[in-house]
Amino acid sequence: LPLTELQVAYYAIEKNFGDKFVDSFKEIMEALRMANFNLNDASKLLHVHKNTLIYRLDKIRETLNVDPLGNNNDREFVNGFYYYLKRKEQIYQV
């Protein structure tokens, strides 16, 4: 997808799923990225049990219909959404 279309999609996701989902998504994605998408390491960074992280990740999978651990295209999509949210956060100091 072209960048402008992705930005429209990211904006729609952010607005339709609300702050609670977005905050949880950012927290999980930050930990997964820091842990190179290793669930054990990410769960330690989040100070939660691995099964709790899996449960939260399943909620993201169901909501966005993506599998960032099993599909590289989906991983790129969620990484893009994460960068979109972080960039917006920096611009608006939200």
What does each model-found stretch correspond to?
Residues 1-94:
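Cytosolic nucleotide-utilizing catalytic cores of signal-transduction proteins
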